[in-house]
From Swiss-Prot:
The protein's name: NAD(P)H-quinone oxidoreductase subunit 4L, chloroplastic
NCBIfam families associated with the record: PRK05715.1-2, PRK05715.1-4, PRK05715.1-5
Keywords: Chloroplast, Membrane, NAD, NADP, Plastid, Plastoquinone, Quinone, Thylakoid, Translocase, Transmembrane, Transmembrane helix, Transport
EC number(s) given by UniProt: 7.1.1.-
Transmembrane parts of this sequence: 2-22, 32-52, 61-81
Species of the source: Panax ginseng
Length: 101
């Protein structure tokens, strides 16, 4: 696969994730869009690592670290969303201003 094809795929994933993050009113959907953005970044890390120096695995190793951090971020984010839903009975972003109460 050529470099341009992978970069176009990554840019498409990033732009879909960014659009979803900006327009989403649901917290779970916003977390999913954030994961799309992080996966697009991981694709770029692996692609550039393979394209510029295929003998070293720096991009793949860094991508594994980003995946681990993204998994922790998703777990913490879903725990926060679950807690907000338990208290407010809503997971809409515009209804969860926690500074009011």
């Amino acid at each position: 696969m050529m470099l341009e094809h992978v970069l176009v795929l990554s840019a498409y994933l990033f732009s879909v994730g960014l659009y979803g993050l900006i327009t989403s009113r649901n917290m779970v959907r916003a977390l999913m869009c954030l994961e799309l953005i992080l996966n697009a970044v991981n694709i770029n890390f692996v692609t550039f690592s393979d394209f510029f120096d295929s003998r070293q695995l720096k991009g793949a190793i860094f991508s594994i670290f980003v995946i681990a951090i993204a998994a922790a971020e998703a777990a913490i984010g879903l725990a926060i969303v679950s807690s907000i839903y338990r208290n407010r009975k809503s997971i809409r972003i515009n209804q969860s201003n926690l500074l009011n109460k």
